[in-house]
Design a protein with these regions (language model features):
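Conserved, mostly hydrophobic/aromatic
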Residues: 3, 36, 40, 71, ...
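Hydrophobic faces of well-ordered beta-strands that scaffold small-molecule active sites
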Residues: 3-5, 44-46, 79-84, 110-114, ...
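N-terminal beta1-alpha1-beta2 module of alpha/beta enzyme domains
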Residues: 1-74, 159, 173-180
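Acidic-and-aromatic substrate-binding clefts and catalytic sites of carbohydrate-active enzymes
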Residues: 50-54, 58-62, 87-92, 208-214, ...
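An alpha-helical appendage that flanks or caps ligand/catalytic pockets
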Residues: 4-9, 34-38, 126, 132-176, ...
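Active-site mouth loops of central-metabolism enzymes
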Residues: 13-27, 83-92, 129, 176-187, ...
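Short, acidic/polar
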Residues: 23-36, 94-97, 184-194
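Acidic (Asp/Glu)-rich catalytic clusters
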Residues: 37-38, 68-77, 98, 102-110, ...
Length: 271
């Protein structure tokens, strides 16, 4: 078992707590990453949003990929699990970017968390088309094939509904062979079919152990039917540490009660 944490690129992760004592700044996250290595953490997940959906759209948010490149240069053991949304990145260019960061970090420390987008307002404000749910997954499927094959082949060409690549060469290849680890999560049938075929690890939100167990069983069976290596799994969770269970439950109620006046409330359920 390995342990990681979400890098506070938005200044924390609680929508209704204005100041969590974490800055959305390079200075803060770089110190945190180096300290987390000393404490024995295995990885950090670097979320990707151009607007801050936690503290409100006017609040600062760090760019995922430039932050990952910088962290690769100042850390030595921490896996950098960088979120990427295919609607915001051309696959050939992202494949090149990722391979370069993999060399900066060394030791196969770069991995991808592929997210098929969810925030319509952000896409509109940044001039990106926001497609319907299943169309986004169809795009992601093409995107993943191009990225994977460019990491493994040269003089690669592809013609699909969403992307076209003509005789592309990508050098240097990633240090991680056969490719950097690809994580993804999702509950829909389209998501699970895509992930079981094209990804290496399935990540889930925290849930009752019985439900997590069922998700693991389902994805493992899908993977086995495809004749692919066993799927890896990850679960996200919050840790609340207090002196008594009563205090812990009180804190749980406080941090999960998202009020309408919270700066990030407007984006809370925008799928």
């Amino acid at each position: 078992m390995r342990y990681g944490y979400w890098l506070p690129v938005f200044g924390g992760w609680l929508r209704n707590v204005e100041d969590e004592g974490m800055e959305a700044s390079w200075n803060y996250v770089s110190k945190l990453a180096r300290r987390s290595e000393q404490l024995g953490y295995d990885l950090t997940l670097i979320a990707e949003l151009n607007l801050n959906d936690i503290k409100g759209v006017e609040a600062p948010s760090l760019d995922a990929w430039s932050t990952a490149a910088a962290l690769a240069a100042v850390t030595t053991t921490l896996e950098l699990m960088v979120a990427v949304r295919p609607t915001f990145h051309q696959p050939a260019l992202l494949a090149k970017q990722a391979a370069n960061i993999d060399h900066i970090g060394g030791n196969g420390r770069l991995s991808l968390n592929v997210v098929s987008s969810w925030w319509a307002d952000e896409a509109r404000k940044y001039g990106v088309e926001f497609e319907q749910h299943d169309d986004r997954y169809a795009r992601t499927r093409e995107w993943l094939e191009i990225v994977e094959r460019l990491w493994q082949e040269d003089h690669f060409s592809y013609s699909g509904k969403y992307y076209h690549v003509d005789d592309a060469v990508l050098q240097p290849k990633p240090t991680t062979r056969p490719r950097p680890t690809i994580y993804a999560g999702g509950e829909s049938e389209a998501a699970k079919e895509l992930i079981s075929r094209w990804c290496d690890a399935y990540v889930m939100h925290g849930d009752e152990p019985s439900r997590v167990r069922e998700k693991i069983r389902d994805m493992s069976e899908r993977r086995e039917r495809l004749g692919l290596p066993p799927m890896k799994f990850g679960v996200a969770a919050y840790a609340i540490v207090r002196d008594t269970e009563t205090e812990a439950k009180r804190e749980l109620e406080r941090v999960t009660n998202v009020q309408q006046f919270a700066a990030g409330y407007e984006n809370y359920q925008q799928w």
